[in-house]
């Protein structure tokens, strides 16, 4: 059985491990570590909204999502699922949970992903996000998406 709950500072090490494993395959493609691999998860856990999907049988976190509020807009800053747990619906469950959470306060949610993360771009389009711009930030080629909630 799985549940989604608010992340706590005690989850930091599991979240960092998931980020490292999930984004490792992009290091060579991008030429450096993707932003989620160097994110300050303790800061996110203390200052932003972090949700985890957890196996209730063994307390193992399967994935996480980080939501930040920037200029009165909600951003899905980071979402990842442990690589051996992909394609099992955990990312979709987390995304739906986040969208429901944000819909109580806002009518849209935004996100960005790296241009070279093709499967992420395709996935976001499949689940209803619309691309609205492309921009290079801190050396990362980013594709920006928005979704009406």
Where are the model-predicted features located?
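Conserved GNAT acetyl-CoA-binding A-motif
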Residues: 102-113
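Conserved active-site alpha-helix within GNAT-family acetyltransferase domains
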Residues: 92, 116-133
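Terminal substrate-recognition subdomain of acyl/acetyltransferases
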Residues: 142-149
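Acetyl-CoA-dependent GNAT
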Residues: 9-12, 16-78, 82-84, 95-97, ...
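Conserved N-terminal entry element of GNAT/NAT acetyltransferase domains
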Residues: 1-10
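Conserved beta-strand-loop-alpha-helix junction that forms the acyl-donor binding cleft
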Residues: 111-121, 137-141
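Active-site acidic-Proline motif in GNAT/NAT acetyltransferases
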Residues: 82-84, 88, 115-116
